UniProtKB/Swiss-Prot annotation:
Receptor for cAMP. GO terms for biological process: adenylate cyclase-activating G protein-coupled receptor signaling pathway; cell surface receptor signaling pathway. Coiled coil: none annotated. Residues 25-38, 105-145, 209-234, 289-318 are cytoplasmic. Belongs to the G-protein coupled receptor 5 family. Disulfide bonds join 81-177. It is found in: Membrane. Gene3D superfamilies: Rhodopsin 7-helix transmembrane proteins. This is Cyclic AMP receptor-like protein F. It is a multi-pass membrane protein. It comes from Dictyostelium discoideum. PANTHER family: CYCLIC AMP RECEPTOR-LIKE PROTEIN F, G PROTEIN-COUPLED RECEPTOR 157-RELATED.
């Protein structure tokens, strides 16, 4: 228990700072906002609140609120641990679902881009750019699509967390306040989405990587189209990195909960889960800070060179 608390004390504050870094820079710089980075922004919000669970866990530990147990009964659960368990389930699912929507987004945009390249329609060929009515229509389409993503993610998380709460299944667990009982069937409300999202994300990533390896930019395309295709490719790779981080950092939690359900010794995975899940937000912030778009923007802010036409520099922006 003390080892877990120590891990939370080290990892959680760093990860929360990482999430805030993404949130603040996204809000400050319009050039970082596009149809893909919207997903990164909302995942960062989910990460921030989910990681704050670990700060609350530390506080509960030092004020002696029970939250670590392998008991299967939830009859003695205090309201504080119950509330933290519900909070954790909601934002944990939000982190998972926003990661999954990134997978869907990059898969859809990649094959949408392939169709546009085949038609060689340069004028309407950008994700968030263009001109005149095409730009306005495209932005309206993006806004409507994002609304559906919001409805899916937040609606799913609310229903998922509420059903478990109504059934009074939140309480102390091996890693803090969550769903009580290692072999509690209600844990499949967490495991099934994890199994599904991790499996489909791996399959989609492999398919896209194979396609990207086979596809080669055409030197016959106009300069602007070539630059756009390169930038679009860079941004898809960035989104894929976020998806890969989700797979890597949530895999230990998936293995842990699966082993717990079957009653297998899992001390190593308890500690690994504490490290990986609490550090996911930090890993996301590192990908965000090292992206070509962010680095170019920061370079221009620091060097302060005028007339660099940032509107044309990143054509994939809205």
């Amino acid at each position: 228990m003390k080892d877990i608390i120590l891990i939370y004390m080290i990892c959680a504050p760093i990860s929360m700072i990482g999430s805030l870094f993404i949130i603040i820079t996204w809000l400050l710089y319009a050039k970082l906002k596009n149809s893909g980075s919207n997903f990164i922004f909302f995942q960062a919000i989910s990460d921030f609140f989910f990681t704050s669970k670990y700060i609350i866990t530390i506080i509960f530990y030092y004020i002696n609120i029970p939250q670590f147990s392998d008991e299967t009964s939830s009859t003695d659960t205090n309201p504080y641990c119950f509330s933290l368990g519900l909070f954790s389930q909601f934002f944990g699912q939000a982190t998972i679902m926003w990661s999954y929507t990134m997978t869907v987004k990059v898969f859809h945009s990649y094959f949408e881009m392939k169709k546009k390249n085949n038609n060689n329609n340069i004028g309407s060929n950008n994700i968030g750019g263009g001109g005149g009515g095409n730009n306005s229509n495209k932005q309206n389409s993006i806004d409507k699509t994002l609304k559906w993503y919001h409805l899916f993610v937040w609606g799913f998380c609310l229903v998922n967390a509420t059903i478990i709460g109504i059934s009074k299944q939140y309480g102390p667990s091996s890693t803090g306040c969550w769903i009580v009982g290692a072999n509690n069937p209600y844990r499949f409300f967490e495991l099934v989405p994890l199994y599904f999202t991790i499996t489909t994300s791996i399959i989609i990533l492999i398919l896209i990587l194979v396609k990207m390896k086979k596809s080669k930019p055409s030197s016959l395309l106009p300069t602007e189209s070539m630059r756009y295709n390169q930038q679009a490719r860079e941004f898809k790779i960035q989104l894929m990195k976020f998806v890969l981080i989700f797979i890597i950092f949530w895999l230990p939690a998936t293995v842990l909960r699966t082993l717990e359900y079957f009653g297998i010794e899992k001390t190593f995975f308890i500690l690994l889960d504490a490290v990986s899940v609490s550090l996911q937000a930090l890993a996301n912030s590192l990908v965000w800070a090292t992206s070509p778009q962010f680095l170019k923007l920061m370079k221009r802010k620091v060097v302060n060179k005028p007339n660099k036409q940032m509107e044309r520099e990143y054509l994939i922006n809205k």
